[in-house]
Amino acid sequence: MLEKFEKNYDVSVIHAWGMTEMSPLGTIGAFKSGMEELSFDEKMDIKLKQGRASYMVEMKITDDDGNELPWNGKDFGHLLVRGPFIASKYMKGDGGQILDNQGFFDTGDVATIDELGFMQITDRSKDVIKSGGEWISSIELENIAVGHPDVAEAAVIGIFHPKWDERPLLICVPAEGKEPNKDNVLEYLQDKLAKWWLPDDVVFVDE
C-alpha cells in the first residue's frame, strides 16, 4: 500500500506507532540524515518499519528471562519502553507493578530493532509461538502464506507438541476456484522460511 501511494499518487506515507500508555506516540518513521539518497526499494524497507523512538522515549527488546537482545534487525523479543510520558501504573493499581526494575513498560508486542534504531513489530507476545526455545512469529508466517496464489486467507496457531512445547499449524482459506493442498503450500513456504518455522501441518477451511 505504501508503494502504491508513492508511485501512483506521489504521496509519502510516514509510519508511526504508539499506545494509550505512551500518551500516545512511541516511534515515528522519519529518515536519518542521508537516507533520502537510498534507492526506492531501500527506502520502502525502512518505511515498512514502525520507526525510531520519539523524543525522550527509550526502547529495548528482551528475551523471556529479561535479558536484553541486540539491535541487529534480526533478533526479536519483548518490546519495552521507558520515558516521562509513559504510564507507571494503572488506575487503582489494576495489574499490579507494570514496570521492570529499570522502569521499562512491557508493551505486549514482539519486535526487532535494527542497528540504526528502527523498530519493527512482528507479533503480539500472546500470539507468538514458542517452539523448542525459539520464537516463531505467527503474523510473519501468515503474511508469507497469503502470498501463495491459491490462498486467500491464512491464520497460524500454536498447537501442543510433547518435545518442542508448541509447533505452528497453518489454516488456509483457498482462493476462489482454487484447490491448494498441503504439499504445494509447504513447498511454496520452504525457501522463504527457516526450516524450523515450517508448519507441521496445513488444514483448509471454507472461511
Can you say where each PLM-predicted feature lies in the sequence?
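Gly/Ser/Thr-rich phosphate-binding loop
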Residues: 1-44, 58, 65-70
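Glycine-centered tight turns that cap/initiate beta-strands
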Residues: 10, 56, 150-153, 201, ...
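Active-site glycine-centered loops adjacent to acidic/histidine catalytic or metal-binding residues
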Residues: 18, 51, 109, 133
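Short Gly/Pro-enriched turn/cap motifs at secondary-structure boundaries
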Residues: 44-53, 100-103
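Active-site glycine/GP-rich loop and adjacent strand/helix microenvironment
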Residues: 51, 70-73, 89-92
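Conserved beta-loop-beta connector loops within the AMP-binding
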Residues: 56-80, 115-116, 178-182
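Flexible lysine-rich "adenylation lid" loop at the C-terminal edge of ANL adenylation domains
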Residues: 66, 194, 205-207
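AMP-binding/adenylate-forming catalytic core of the ANL superfamily
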Residues: 83, 88-89, 110-197, 203
